[in-house]
Regions:
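Conserved, structured core segments of small domains
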Residues: 1-117
Length: 117
């Protein structure tokens, strides 16, 4: 089964941010190493890192008219994603727990990938 993992950064220190600068060099290297190791996990297809939420645009069409709003649709925008093909939800949860954002102030949302058409 395929699962989509949505990575919500929350207060996770992001490279280039003030919070990132509070991490030691060893902590920064460990975070990068953890992500690199996750990307090598069999069945894992990493997505591209997403830009910061303030760079997002949200598009809706209401009564045929296009509406564009600055920022993410939800207050806490996603910072990344991946697709993990594994046996079951428990395996997806185990992988999600290894994502640095899960322990550094963020959260990982897991959804089964469905094919409707």
């Amino acid at each position: 089964m395929k699962y989509v993992l949505l990575i919500y950064q929350g207060t996770t220190p992001l490279p280039g941010s003030e919070r990132w600068k509070t991490q030691s060099e060893a902590e920064q290297k460990q975070i990068f190493a953890d992500y690199a190791q996750l990307n090598q996990t069999p069945g894992m297809t990493p997505g591209l890192p997403l830009g910061l939420p303030d760079a997002a645009r949200t598009v809706q069409v209401v009564d045929g008219k296009v509406h564009v709003k600055n920022g993410p649709y939800q207050a806490e925008g996603a910072g990344g994603y991946g697709v993990y093909e594994c046996e079951n939800m428990e395996a997806a949860i185990a992988l999600a727990a290894r994502i640095p954002a899960a322990r550094l102030g963020g959260a990982i949302e897991i959804r089964p990938a469905e094919q409707y058409w």
